[in-house]
Structure formats: C-alpha cells, structure tokens
Amino acid sequence: MVARNLYELLEHAALDPQDNKISVYNPGNVDQVGKSLTYADLLNTAKTNALLLPQVKGIRPDSVILLHFDNHFDAIVWFWSVIAAGYVPAISTPFTNDPEGRKKHLIHLKTLLKDPVIITQESLAKAFSIVDGLNTHTIESIQKFDAPHILNGVHATAKQHDDLAVLMLTSGSSGNAKAVCLRHGQLLQSIAGKSTHHGISKSDVFLNWIGLDHVANLTETHLQAMQHAAPQFHVQASDLLVDPLILLKLIDRHRITVTFAPNFFIASVRVALEHPEPFLHGKEPDLTCFRIMISGGEANVVEASQALTTLFQKYGVSSEFIRPGFGMTETCAGSIYSRECPSYDVSNKWEFASLGTCIPGLQMRISSDSGEILSMNQVGNLELFGPILFHEYYNNPVATAEAFTADHWFRTGDHASIDGNGRLSLAGRAKETIIVNGVKYFPHELETAIEDALIPGLTPSYTVVFPHRPKNSQTEAVCVVYLPSYEPEDVLARVGVADAISKISIMQTGVKPFQIIPLDKTLLPKSSLGKLSRAKTRAAFEAGKYEVFQKLNDDAIHAYRATQNQAPSNETEATILHVFADLFEIPEADIGVNTSLFEMGVSSIEIIKFKQRIQTELKLKVEIPVITMLTNPTIRGLAGTLETLMGPQVYSPKVTLQAEGKKTPLWLVHPGVGEVLVFLNLAKFIVDRPIHALRARGFDGEPFFEDIAEVVSTYHQAIKEEQPEGPYAIAGYSYGSMLAFEVSKVLEANGDKVEFLGVFNLPPHIKFRMRQLDWVEVLLNLSYFLDLMTEEEAHRISPEMHELSNSLGNDKVLDYILERAPRERMHEMALDRKKMSTWADLAYRMQAIAQDYDPSGRVRNMDIFYAIPLVAVAKSKKEWVDNHLVKWRGFVDEEPHWHEVDGAHYTMLGPDNIHTFQKTLRASLEERGL
C-alpha cells in the first residue's frame, strides 16, 4: 500500500517485520549508541505525545509548531509527535553567533509563522527570552500533562498529498528567513525519486550527521530510510568533524551503505587517510558494504573526489561511490545527481564535478536574463520544474512571486550549463553568499561587524567582504578589502588592522580570511548612493587588479612577523609549536612562540583538535579547559599556563583576555560567582586596548578570601603590578561592581587617576540581597549563570531543592542538578562534580563576606550600565533606577553617566546582547577620554 502522507509512511515502517531501528549516538560519545527505538516505538511515542499537544497553552488547530533542539533524538521524536497530532512542524535552524542577527531572526519568525507555538528543551529555552511575547514551551513541561484517552482535533491520517506537511527555514542566519512549504505528496515523490535514481532498497543502512533542520537529514536520510523501513544511525556533527576517521569506523561497525558528506568533509577525510598509518591504534575498517556518499552544499573538487575514491578502494569499496548533487530546501534536498564521479569528470578534464541528471519528478533548463531558453553548454540561469518542487513560501507572497517565472519554473538563483549528455554543471551563484565548509554566511554581516569594531587604521564605510574560491581549494574563502587610514610605512598599524579583521572573521565565520588587502581609495569607488559594489570588487580581485597592493601588504606583514618570531625556550614550547605547525600545515620556521592562534584562523573544532593533540603529546593527566586555550592564544602563553597546570598551583587574580592595543587597559572584576568567563564575549569585540579580568581565589584549591579588605588589597596589587601608572579604567559586573568601587577608592587615595569606573547593574547597598542567598540559592544561580539550566527552571525548583537540602543535605541538591545538566555544556566547561562543588562553595563564600557590607567614601566619577533587574529586587527598570541605582549619587563627586543597555541582569553580557553592550561601553570609554 502506498502512503498518502507522512504519518502513513511511519505507520507502514512500523509494521515492517524486520523491526529495524533508528539509533542515535549521544553528543561526545561515538563508542556506543546512546538511544535507539524501532519504527513501531517511534510511532507509539509520537501517538502518546500527540495526546498531550492540544493541551499546550495558546495552541490552535492551524498553529505552526516551531521545534528547536540541539540533538537528533528529541528532534526526531517531537517532529513525529507534531505530525501525529495533525499540526504543521517548522524546524528551527541553529541560532547565529551574531546577537543582533539572532534577535532579529526570532522577531521575524514570530511574524512570519503567525505567532507559532515554540517547543524546545529546558536547557535551550533561555535563548528565546530575548524576545517578548513568544509562546515557548519545553518538552519537560509538556510531558507532565495528563493524557486524555482520545485525540481531539485534526487527525494525521486525514492529510492528503497537497496538504502542508512541514515548514523548513532558509537563510536562518539572517533576519529574512523564508519558510519553505513542503507538502506530503511532494516529500513522498521526492524520496521515491531519490531511491529510484540511486537504486536504494530496504537492504540499505543509512548514516546521518546533519541536523533535522536541514533537508539533507530530513529527506535525504531520515524519510528515505523510513520509506524502506531501513536502519538509520545518527551521530553529532561535532564528533565527526573533530575526527573524520570516525566516519569510516561507523561505516564498518554498522555496515553503512549510504551517507552524506559535503566537499569540505570529503577533503578532511582524505587528509586524515593520507597520514602515515591512519589506523595505527586500531583495526583498519572494512568498507566492502559502502556504496553511496551523497555530496552537496558546495562544488565538489574532482581531484579530491578522485583521491578519496582511490583511498576508499584500499579498504574494500569496489566502485565509484561519491554522488555530487544539486538540491535546495525548495526541492526537498538533492534532486539532480551524478552517478559517474569522478570518471566522467576526469574524462572531461574538469576541475569541479558534474552534478549529473534529474531524478524522476524534476526537469531543468537554462535561460538567459531576458528569458530565452539556452542551448547546451551555454551558461545561464538554472530553472527547475516538476511535482517535487515547492509551490510557495509560507506567509510570503512577494518572495513566492519572485521565485517563479511566468510559466511557473522555479528560479534557483544559480548560474549553470547543461552539456551534450544532459549533465548539469554549476558556474556560480547569482546570490551574494559565502559558503565556507558547507555553511552559508552573508558578506554584509561580516562587513557590519568589522565596521562596528571601529578598528584603528581602518576608514569607516570602505570595507568590502566577498567570496573567492582559490584554485584547488576544497571550499570557498573569505576575502576582505578596506581603505587604510594609516601611512603606508606604518607596519604596526597595518598588522593591527589585519589581526583585528582576522579575529572578527573567526568570531563570525570560524575562519580567517584568505586575503585582507588595504587598497587605494581610487580602487574603492562608491555609487551615487554611496554604495560599494561587491560584485565589481570581486571581479577586480579575480582579474588580478589588486595584486600589487596584495604583495606589498603580504611582504610587509611577513617581514614584520619574521622579526618578531622567537624560538622555543623549553621542551613544552617546542612540543606545542610542533603541534601548531602540523595542525595548520605551515613550516615551523615561519612561526614563533609568540604566534597566536588567532593569526592562524582557528575554528572551535580546530581548538578542540589542538587541545586534544597537546594533551596527547605532553601526556597531560589533567584536562585543559577551553578557556585556557582562548585566553592564552600564543604558544608561549599556553606553555606557561600548562606548566602551571602540571605543577603546584600559584594563585594570580589576573587573566588577560586581550593583550593587543595601545589604549588604556580595561580591568574587569568578576561577578559573585568569582569566574571571568562572562567577559570572553566582550573581549572579542574590543581590539584597541588590553583587557584584563580579575578572578577570585579558590578555584584551584587555594583558601577562599576571608573578607572584602583582602579581596581589594589583592586586586589592587595585581593591577599595580601589571599597570604601574594610570589613568585607570575599571568595571565590575554585578557583585564585581562593589569590588571595582572599593579598588578605585584605594587607587584614588594613593594619588592615582581612575578615569573610568563602570558599574554593571548593581546598587551600592547589597547586604540585604547577600543575606537572601544560602548555599542552595547560590548553586542554582551558578547553574543558570553557566547555562546548565534556565533562570525560570532555577526559580521553579528552588523550593524543592531547599526541601531536599534540609532532609538529605547539599550533596543531593548537587546530584540533582548534575544529573540534568547538558553533557555537552559540562564537557565544554570542563566541569565535573568536584569542580562544581568547589565553585559553589567559592561563590557562597564571596556572598557571605558581603553580608555586612556598607558602602562608604567617594570616587570622582562613575558610569552606570543598567538592565532589567532581578525579580527579587525590583519590578521594573524605572523602580530599579529610582529606588536603588540612584543611591550611587551619594558616593560620587560628579553626576554619574547613565547607560541603559539591552537584556536582563544575567543576560546583559550574553551573546544576545553583547553586540549592543560593547558599543555602549566603548562609547563611554571614548567619552571619558580613554
């Protein structure tokens, strides 16, 4: 029987006698499957959850359900739960790192999806709090509902071919996401067409590592496997990207026949296999089962495909297996594939692989800009037609109209040609995007971030970011050109701008730019509207018109770095330098111990790789915290810190978050939890001055501070040792504001000038709040400060935790929290039970020594940054300012400068608000003459 809709597809799979499973690996563990369920199990679970969904507050029969998860298992279960209940799921894409973009994205989705019901997990719910009025619910809260005996509302089995099945989001990293309407019949025809094209049957076994928010998972793997009731395995992308050889081990272990891999990952697997003895510490994989590797998202390099095919043949693959394809969300993922890679491409001597022919249900053509249909081998606009195509963008008639020609063919936005054998080849994209390692970025977002950084030496409004694919490269690269404001011979300024742009690019895209070129103003002409042409800039670069400027810049920076490079002075430095050179594939002679990770263009994946390699090479018995890598980016700095880690711990409060820049250093004092991690995001944006943070004593077994006087004395001494002379700039976050105030008084009493004293959302009188915080409350505050739970959850369980503490002790409270904490977050923070317990004790001690604190004395000036207050202390910003913060006036000679900032007390420095906060902070420093 042929399924009429997705629900029937699952029903049919559940009846299959082989009882095959969907198996999911937990994040961080690829040694054994974490969770699995048969198709029958999935159907039963979905039906059970479907009984609960109509009870969700605000849900309507026509509601869109926006699903947001960070793991495969929950995403799959709740996707089918929504389908079973008869609603339309919209699968949320991962949030961007750009706070402003993320907020804009959520506000846009609220309108686009007509006030959707949002379902997520408790550990992710906090991300939605930045936008008012969102109807957000957690799966943990929904599962506590009482289930009725019958399901009211729309029955999933009643859905027809033309009914809307799911909404998939496109361009999720910008504020103009579109929701693609995928229909039941469209999806079913698509997976049938894929299977026919590739010869897939129920004997196949699927492996996926892409999120369900991407059609490369939903249709290419999940639904296609379900169509055949075939086994499917899901692993986290982060686990494969750290060690690409895990792919081969999983293929061997589960006898995988079908998987997906973009070109950048093919290149990573190739590099790993070309290492001498890649499986030195384990058995070689048996790949005789493997036959299909779907590849899409970016152009496939023929040379890399040929190399990987040869390498896989050593492990038993008998034929060509890479299937380069073309697809979009609008076409249910891949819809045009080559089955002759690399042989067809090698015979034609092509650099990039052909994309082959259409699957059943799709036609393609090439047209000119005027609408003329072009003949073979002519480059033009790729257009598609057929029943597997979408019909519309949800709630967006303008975009829908623009997407189709007058005769209803879909405009893909790609330039392409079709050869004499009917094979498709892409020639580029009409749309302005950059695809780096399979991930799409928008040039204007990186341009904005660079401009907002106010980099010394860079002229505002003359920065252009564009994509470029270097010859033989496996992926596109980022290029940046700018107008310098420094003199050509000012090498320090030249290097400073390059490093600042690199740092911002790494933060935004995860990679260092391929080229950063300062240009003459004559090469950056603006239109009558004051715009720079990205297309013309890219064309000029690729035509070689910037080569003179590029060579001059590269030579100057290379010569400067060569004079600055220093040789290793001990074995630890030499080992780290060797790992550094090997990982980034650069000669050891070209780097020194003062070379920074940020100069190399690190991504988070490469930081983890670097960390793991160092731990192995140095045979470390302790885990290197990620913060250690981020705050000690040079080889010498990291070596010194690691030697400290390996030897007796000597406490120093100073943690340098940013060492570069000539402006007055900024000192940041920790909040009540004692740690300085909260300042990392802020330090990324400030490239023109050193940033030092002050960290509490006791994290590494030292005695906790006895009183505030000892804290102030210790921090004052640390500041004077690093910066003997003023002027000084000091700021504190929350509890740290009190300490910054006290340190400033000591500095001024000794004749030093404190030109800037920043108070981040703290009033002068705090002892009443300090007395409210017992150990349990401190632990709960710490837990949501570390994103181990949401603030709402901490408040909700507080009474229960206090009862648990009173009856069984604090250890049981800690057990409760750690059992429910996200594993990935614990691993990222290098947290274990002992560290968490110590941290809670330290934070409680910091609160305790302030229980009798009364402010006294005066400082010359103060800048007060205020956000939404804690519910426990004030009901509104107005009440917070008028009744609490205003009392600082009694302790300052001049009227304080007031700065209203976005977010709430615990989120004002978070990723969602840091972009606007840093602008306000930098402007206030400038206003104070710093």
Swiss-Prot record:
O-(pantetheine 4'-phosphoryl)serine, modified sites: S604
E.C. number(s) listed in UniProt: 2.3.1.-
Stretches assigned to the Carrier domain: 567-646
InterPro entries: AB_hydrolase_fold, ACP-like_sf, AMP-bd_C_sf, AMP-binding_CS, AMP-dep_synth/lig_dom, ANL_N_sf, PKS_PP-bd, PP-bd_ACP
Pfam families referenced in this protein's UniProt entry, alphabetically: AMP-binding (PF00501), PP-binding (PF00550), Thioesterase (PF00975)
MF (Gene Ontology): phosphopantetheine binding; transferase activity; very long-chain fatty acid-CoA ligase activity
Region described as Thioesterase (TE) domain: spans on this chain: 665-914
Highest taxon above the source species: Eukaryota
Catalytic activity: 2 3-phenylpyruvate + 2 ATP = polyporic acid + 2 AMP + 2 diphosphate + H(+)
Alphabetical keyword list: Phosphopantetheine, Phosphoprotein, Transferase
Entry's transmembrane regions: none
GO terms under biological process: fatty acid biosynthetic process
Record-stated family: Belongs to the NRP synthetase family.
Protein name, per record: Nonribosomal peptide synthetase acyN
